[in-house]
Every structure is written in structure tokens, then in C-alpha cells.
Amino acid sequence: MRNIALTLKYLGIAYHGWLVQKTVTTVGQTLEEAAAAVVGHPVHMTGCGRTDAGVHARVYVANFRTTARIPCDRLPYALNTHLPEDIVVTNAMEVHDDFNAIGSCVRKEYTYLIYNSGIRDPFYVNRAWFYPKHLDETVMQRAADCFVGTHDFAAVRSVGTDVKSTVRTVYYYKIEREGDLISLRVCANGFLYNMARAMAGTCVYAAEGKFPPEDVAQILLNGDRTAAGPTVPPGGLYMTKLWYDDGKAVFHVG
């Protein structure tokens, strides 16, 4: 049985996230159906992370097992003939048997886009969060700096989610403006549910003056979700980089 890793990208507007669900269309389900049509048997896709409804991926990795002998260099073309235009497979490679798209991933980068202008741009609808009040990206960066390091991130996760530990390590959080578009790039060894979006909302709250940006450090220490900023809309969030190192497969995409 071959273990195949796919690299893909998708626009998440039409999908209810990655995870396969019975009553709604998801990216994972759509990819599984396309792969089954190509290899001639049902497949199970393991994705590199749970992206929510409306979230996009400039890069995404999934793996599946197959008995089909189709060469990896032909797989992207074959899969794309069965996929809608908003999901594209860009690469396929055979990996070792223990490779797992989520378990072998050691770092991820998400980018959140804010369209910060007094007039909305229709080309950014569901692709960036329209925010008409001017934001000072230097204040946002001061708040973002407080997230860097190893912390308990319970204050920026969705309440009611159950995980073994809420401690994560953030390697960098960079906020940049280019014209009216503000990008927030954050890299960590893992993300809690809605963590990236809540971190973005907290940086926005700091720029609004709801609390000094340096207070974010204390908000993390207190672990109070209500003290942090809101969970911003999903349409501005993109998975943008992935790092893999499980001792056998070492690579990064994005």
C-alpha cells in the first residue's frame, strides 16, 4: 500500500471547512471523492489541520493510501480533472509508511488579511476582513510581540473546546501594511481552535485602544477569554506555510 502526500491550495468560501461531514460540503470530502475516482477505490484523506468554514489555504498537505500504481507526477493532473476550480492539487509524492499529514507537521504559519480602508473593495469580500476604522499597525505589532514564545494560550481559544494542553510555542508574529492591506503572519508549533483568529482580534482591540498592547502578556497569564479580543471572521484567514520533520520526511511548503 502506497502512502501519497498531496500539496494543494483552495479557496474556502464554498466549503464548511476541511473535515468530512455528512450534511455539508467540505474540502476533505471533495478531495476524497476526486481521489477515489482516480485510483478506483475509496480513500481516506488525513489533512494537516482543521480549517474552519470559509478559511482558505495557500498551501495544505494531505495524505492517503492507495494500491493504485499511477505515477506521482501524473496524480495532480488526474485529480484536478475531478476537482472544482477552487481546489487545486499542485504536487504529489510518495512518502514513508508512517508519514502523517498532521502528526508529522512540526510548524504551521497562518496569515490573516485585513482590508483597512474607509471604502470596501468587492474583490476582497470573503478574502480579507473589511475594517473601515484606521488601525495603527505599529500598535498591533506591539501586541503581537506579547504572543511570541511558549505560553498558555487559553485566553485566545474558543471556549468549550477540549484539548490535553493549551500551551503552545509561537515562533514569530509579524504585522505589515501594504497600502490598505494589513497582513498578520503567525507561526507556531500548533494552534488551538480559533486561536489565530482570536489573536488577530486581540491585536485589533489593542490598536483600537481598548487596552494597552503590552497588556496582552497579562491577558495570556490570566487565561480569560473574555479579556482578549474577538474571534475575527474566517474569510481573512489563510494557511500559508507548513514545516515537516518526522525523522524521515523533512521538507516545508509555502
Task: Label each residue range with its predicted role.
Residues 1-254:
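Structured-RNA-binding interfaces characteristic of tRNA pseudouridine synthases
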